[in-house]
């Protein structure tokens, strides 16, 4: 297992998820809730891919495989954790925007 390759997979998928979160928030601000939901689902799928790559690495090490320390992998985990929190926050904002839209209608 090339730990740096896995790290890049995590970073790239999480980063793509972050881009979808930004699109979702832009859609929310424009009261395009269907678009926001679509972007959030896309973000969730990409973050899941990143999470799965991370989990496979952790499980391999737990099973006894020698996994060398990698600062890049640590950065990837930090990136994934941060973007996962952003996704959770964006998912919680969608109903708030919907409530605001219904009160202003």
Range-by-range predicted roles:
Residues 1-105:
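Terminal alpha-helical segments
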């Amino acid at each position: 297992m090339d730990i740096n390759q896995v790290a890049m997979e995590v970073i790239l998928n999480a980063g793509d998820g972050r881009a979808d979160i930004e699109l979702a928030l832009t859609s929310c601000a424009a009261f395009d809730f269907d678009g926001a939901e679509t972007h959030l689902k896309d973000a969730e799928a990409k973050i899941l891919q990143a999470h799965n790559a991370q989990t496979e690495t952790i499980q391999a090490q737990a099973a006894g495989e020698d996994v060398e320390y990698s600062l890049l992998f640590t950065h990837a985990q930090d990136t994934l954790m941060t973007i996962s929190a952003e996704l959770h926050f964006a998912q919680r904002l969608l109903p708030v925007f919907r409530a605001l839209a219904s009160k202003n209608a």
